């Protein structure tokens, strides 16, 4: 790629540069309930990457702080947070269709209306659809740890990613991460400690106790019983 200044420039010359992805798309089968939830709710709750830059006020029909979560899994925690914080608007991004269906089914059942979802690559959504300075909180909970050393480059938390994310957060906005993989927690801390424009909200300059706003998952509860740790990190955009 050295002869090109960007992937876009390479593409214009007919050269394709393979992008390192932080996820592996595992398609799993949709249940009938998940399929029905997508059919019933996508028109009102689904967002399309191809539509480009979002007008948050138009999407949600009001002006409110916006929280974005990358990789919400089956969506239980995201729906719970949206229900518990009705004064905020939530956007979730997930690449696995069964998770999209489960999230929409749960949102419908809970009567949650302040939630929208993308079925797309989060890095592309951030770049093309989220306006600079528009997010009050960014959430990344239990991302794939890519625990083998040779795969660490696939971890989503990298200097380039957190710098791009900083531009999307409002001044005073918070990037909240959580992982149950200690080595990844250390990796996150190492990256964020030197990332410009961020301030660690930990009084000990490392991790924070789980904030009340992040629901305790069944997976975590089981982990606690087995003595497994979970690490939360919160960094505020200050510049």
Curated annotation (Swiss-Prot):
Protein EC: 2.1.1.33
GO (cellular component) term, any one: tRNA methyltransferase complex
Protein family: Belongs to the class I-like SAM-binding methyltransferase superfamily. TrmB family.
Keyword list, A-Z: Methyltransferase, S-adenosyl-L-methionine, Transferase, tRNA processing
GO molecular function terms noted in the UniProt entry: tRNA (guanine(46)-N7)-methyltransferase activity
Enzyme active site: 144
Listed transmembrane segments: none
Organism expressing this protein natively: Pseudoalteromonas atlantica (strain T6c / ATCC BAA-1087)
Protein's recorded name: tRNA (guanine-N(7)-)-methyltransferase
Catalytic activity: guanosine(46) in tRNA + S-adenosyl-L-methionine = N(7)-methylguanosine(46) in tRNA + S-adenosyl-L-homocysteine
NCBIfam families for this protein: tRNA (guanosine(46)-N7)-methyltransferase TrmB
Superkingdom: Bacteria
One of the Pfam families matching this protein, by short name: Methyltransf_4
Residue runs in coiled coils: none
InterPro entries assigned to the protein according to its UniProt record, in alphabetical order: SAM-dependent_MTases_sf, tRNA_(Gua-N-7)_MeTrfase_Trmb, tRNA_methyltr_TrmB_bact
Record function comment: Catalyzes the formation of N(7)-methylguanine at position 46 (m7G46) in tRNA.
Pathways per UniProt: tRNA modification; N(7)-methylguanine-tRNA biosynthesis
Amino acids binding substrate: 148, 180, 217-220
Binding site for S-adenosyl-L-methionine: 69, 94, 121, 144
Enzyme superclass (EC): transferase
């Amino acid at each position: 790629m050295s002869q090109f200044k960007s992937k876009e420039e390479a593409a214009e010359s007919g050269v394709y540069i393979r992008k390192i992805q932080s996820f592996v798309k595992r398609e799993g089968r949709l249940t009938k309930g998940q399929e029905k939830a997508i059919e019933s709710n996508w028109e009102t709750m689904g967002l399309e990457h191809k539509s480009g830059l979002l007008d948050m006020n138009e999407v949600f029909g009001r002006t409110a702080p916006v929280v974005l979560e990358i990789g919400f899994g089956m969506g239980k925690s995201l729906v719970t947070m949206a229900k518990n914080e009705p004064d905020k608007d939530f956007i979730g991004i997930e690449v696995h269709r069964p998770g999209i269906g489960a999230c929409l089914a749960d949102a419908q059942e809970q009567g949650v209306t302040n939630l929208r979802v993308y079925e797309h690559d989060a890095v592309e959504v951030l770049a093309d659809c989220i306006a600079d300075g528009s997010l009050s909180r960014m959430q990344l909970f239990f991302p794939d740890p890519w625990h083998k050393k040779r795969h660490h480059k696939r971890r989503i938390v990298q200097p380039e990613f957190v710098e791009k994310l900083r531009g999307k957060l409002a001044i005073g906005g918070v990037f909240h991460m959580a992982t149950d993989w200690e080595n990844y927690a250390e990796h996150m801390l190492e990256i964020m400690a030197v990332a410009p424009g961020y301030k660690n909200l930990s009084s000990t300059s490392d991790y924070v106790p789980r904030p009340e706003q992040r629901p305790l998952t069944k997976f975590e509860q089981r982990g606690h019983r087995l003595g497994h740790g979970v690490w939360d990190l919160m960094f505020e955009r200050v510049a």
